[in-house]
Amino acid sequence: MIRIGHGFDVHAFGGEGPIIIGGVAIPYEKGLVAHSDGDVALHALTDALLGAMALGDIGKLFPDTDIQYKGADSRRLLRTAYQAILDKGYQVGNVDITIIAQAPKMRPYIDSMRTVIAQDLHCDIEQVNVKATTTEKLGFTGRSEGIACEAVVLLIKQNGTK
């Protein structure tokens, strides 16, 4: 059996950089406003994983009203959510992430993001795709007011599990 999940996240720029995207620190003059570390890619991916298994969303599992998640490392949140997926007998088939930002440029960091995500999901790097696009200077991302991200994940039932 397979399950598909979709996730979305957005954060506004604010404060000082760097920013963390896909588990990778990216030098930038602005930071991202968030309760945790503001990693839009890992937040969207975590939401996609949880959604695929009908486990709610990142806000349900890691509420921003809980002080223990203040400044939280999104890699830790991703690994915790993925463990819930593994516990239900599923594993990642593939992941596809689209980062939507006018700036900073993501291309130099994408291979590192893929490596980090593959490590956290215990899968091959070939199962993880990360790409970036702009909105051609339209909307809040086009005005460099923030960053958005979408993620799609395919989960596959592991052999021998109920």
UniProtKB/Swiss-Prot annotation:
Q: Which cofactor does it need?
A: a divalent metal cation
Q: Which PROSITE patterns match?
A: ISPF
Q: What is its EC number?
A: 4.6.1.12
Q: In which pathway does it act?
A: Isoprenoid biosynthesis; isopentenyl diphosphate biosynthesis via DXP pathway; isopentenyl diphosphate from 1-deoxy-D-xylulose 5-phosphate: step 4/6
Gene Ontology molecular function, alphabetical:
2-C-methyl-D-erythritol 2,4-cyclodiphosphate synthase activity; metal ion binding
One family from Pfam that matches here is: YgbB
- Cofactor-binding details, from the entry: Binds 1 divalent metal cation per subunit.
Q: Which UniProt keywords apply?
A: Isoprene biosynthesis, Lyase, Metal-binding
The family database entries (InterPro entries) matched by this protein are listed as: MECDP_synthase, MECDP_synthase_CS, MECDP_synthase_sf
Catalytic activity annotated for this protein?
4-CDP-2-C-methyl-D-erythritol 2-phosphate = 2-C-methyl-D-erythritol 2,4-cyclic diphosphate + CMP
Tell me the GO BP annotations in alphabetical order. isopentenyl diphosphate biosynthetic process, methylerythritol 4-phosphate pathway; terpenoid biosynthetic process
Which positions are annotated as binding 4-CDP-2-C-methyl-D-erythritol 2-phosphate? 9-11, 35-36, 57-59, 62-66, 133-136, 140, 143
Gene3D superfamilies the record matches: 2-C-methyl-D-erythritol 2,4-cyclodiphosphate synthase
| Annotated positions binding a divalent metal cation | D9, H11, H43
Q: Which family does it belong to?
A: Belongs to the IspF family.
- Give a short account of what the protein does: Involved in the biosynthesis of isopentenyl diphosphate (IPP) and dimethylallyl diphosphate (DMAPP), two major building blocks of isoprenoid compounds. Catalyzes the conversion of 4-diphosphocytidyl-2-C-methyl-D-erythritol 2-phosphate (CDP-ME2P) to 2-C-methyl-D-erythritol 2,4-cyclodiphosphate (ME-CPP) with a corresponding release of cytidine 5-monophosphate (CMP).
Q: How does it assemble?
A: Homotrimer.
Recorded protein name is 2-C-methyl-D-erythritol 2,4-cyclodiphosphate synthase
Q: Which organism is it from?
A: Histophilus somni (strain 2336)
Q: Per UniProt, what is the name of the gene that codes for the protein in this document?
A: ispF
